[in-house]
Design a protein with these regions (language model features):
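Acidic, glycine-rich loop-and-beta core segments that form the ion-binding/anion-interacting portion
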Residues: 41-83
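Short alpha-helical scaffold segments that flank and stabilize functional sites
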Residues: 25, 60, 186-189
Length: 234
């Protein structure tokens, strides 16, 4: 294993029960790996829409939702909240690989927005600044994408509005840092081909320009995890 975690998921497993999971390891030429080292100030951040909470934040969700049979209105239709929360996680491989087939040199960084939301995930693609250099950070425009209604429902049920971006993906499940000169074309390609890569029964993916790469003069040592200096909203 190159890395991993133990998901405790409190309140989910009964005593004596366990979860069996699998993983895959890929091999690539070093020159083909997009590791964030080419990210620079002024790069555009493109966000790809999620289908909902995906597979993260459910320890909190189970505290907020006591009756999964309860009906709520989503998209103008009445649905069971449990059914909405079971919407499958969007897989971004096909649309991202399609963009890389034409714009690989213009894509400088990529990251999934998983557990820990924006604050714990977006900074993962940024390299640590060398001594005396500016530290790159994500500048996120909060109202630049459509937030799925399920997140508003969770806030109504008690999720802290100040902390939802450090728990949930809030409608953006994948972020790319791309060169400014090709950002418009990359965005256009994602949206033009979205229906082709759509999974039956799931909403069609949308791509948004959600911000840009800026910098901070602060020296941030150690792990970027959860650092609010590394992901700033405007």
């Amino acid at each position: 294993l190159l890395g991993g975690e133990t998901a405790e998921m409190p309140g989910f497993y009964d005593d004596g029960k366990y979860d069996l999971a699998g993983f895959g390891v890929g091999v690539a030429d070093k020159s083909d790996i997009i590791n964030g080292s080419k990210i620079k100030e002024g790069d555009v951040l493109i966000g790809l829409s999620s289908t909902g909470p995906h597979s993260n934040g459910y320890s909190l969700i189970r505290k907020l939702v006591t009756d999964f049979e309860e009906k709520i209105t989503i998209g103008g239709k009445e649905r069971k909240i449990g059914e909405v929360l079971l919407t499958p996680t969007r897989i971004y491989v096909r649309p991202v690989m399609d963009v890389l087939s034409k714009f690989r040199s213009s894509v400088h960084g990529m990251v999934h927005v998983t557990g820990g939301g924006f604050y714990e995930n977006v900074p993962r693609m940024f390299p640590h600044a060398k001594e005396g250099k500016k530290q790159l950070v994500a500048m996120i425009k909060k109202d630049s994408w459509e937030v799925p209604e399920i997140f508003d429902e969770l806030i109504k049920r008690g999720a802290d509005p100040e902390n939802v971006f450090s728990t949930f993906n809030m409608g953006i499940g994948f972020v790319l840092a791309v060169s400014k000169k090709d950002a418009a074309e990359i965005l256009k390609r994602f949206n033009a081909n979205a229906k082709k890569f759509a999974v039956k029964g799931s909403p069609v993916m949308k791509a948004y320009e959600i911000g840009y790469v800026g910098h901070t003069d602060k020296v941030i040592k150690g792990d970027f995890k959860g650092s609010k200096e590394m992901t700033q909203f405007y």
